[in-house]
Amino acid sequence: MGLSFYLLLLCIVSGLVSGVMAMRRKAVLGAAVAMLVGIAGTIGANRLWPLDGFGLIHVFYLAAVVSLPMFLVGGWFGLRRDDRAPRSRWLLPAVATSIVAVGIYATHIEPYRLEIVREQIVSAQISEPVRIVVLSDIQNSSVGDYEYEVMDAIIAEEPDLVLMAGDLWQLPPWEWPQQIHDFEDLLAYLLEGVPGLVMVDGDSDWPDGYDQLVQRVGPRSLFLFDETSETFVGDQRVVIGGAARGEDNSPAERAVLETLVAAPDDALTILLGHRPAVVFRPDASDGIDLVVAGHTHGGQVSVPFFGPPITFSEVPREVAAGGLHEVDGVPIFVTRGVGMERHQAPQLRFNVRPSIGVIDFVPD
């Protein structure tokens, strides 16, 4: 029995307790007892699976979309035959149904509603159009139909180059030998339909795994670990620098930036990193045409008229939410990614659809 099943069962029990007591017109007592059950259960979970911040968020999410609706329905049953109860009691089942619907949508529907985000950048220094597709944060422990649907969507865009901004997988290292073949097949499938793939590492994966994948899928894939690579799209020179996720402003990373800055004036220069904060690196504003990053997942949850409450990034909230922006004079594209945070986190998206980015560079 895993953590997710345990927490779901805990919230069902808590919801039943509070709902039954609310049905008996003891709503306050029921809420108090349910809270005690929840606290005790969370303490028990913490002994079996030491909870991190994502684990606590998971508890609160399930309490909101499972326990609370059961409590509200119980309260409605307790009031529905009481002629003295306010007519507003009929709001209780409506609110409960709405909460459950949001939970189902956020957990089972939106995480798989892939969106294509299109941007165009006009440049006076390039001679030919270049189309780049940005992919990031698949972040799964296994490969399934959804991941292949993402690859089909990328291939359909007919890109000149695909940039992968890290977090290709998220699983314990000891499971990697059993899963590498599936990720190898996934990348090989992608490379059957696109000219090339350039990748950097993220927070949930590791460089050795990328090295293994590149060796297996062939020369049209490339993993950059504080390195640069030069390629051509037709006659258009493209120079890509890959910033490793590790130490910030390391000598190797500074060398990457220096190489990009020193590239010929007619070259298209791109800095690829996992975290958007790579845009703050020294020299990033000195002639780099575009910074590409992932990491934030767009927040995974976005509040209307506010944006994502949590982004785990130093860039402004609107930048972390995804899309093409400018930070300190540097164009940066942050993709919302195609997957979700795993392990202890609640696996959901709300008002933040998964996405791939299609960026067209066109001559002025």
Region locations from a protein language model:
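Non-catalytic terminal accessory segments
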Residues: 1-111
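A short, polar/charged loop/turn motif at coil->beta-strand junctions and beta-hairpin connectors
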Residues: 17-22, 115, 126-129, 234
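Short, structured coil/loop segments at alpha-helix boundaries
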Residues: 23-34, 84-88, 122-127, 144, ...
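N-terminal signal-anchor transmembrane helix
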Residues: 81-157
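Soluble catalytic domains of enzymes that build or remodel membrane lipids, polysaccharides, and related
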Residues: 125-364
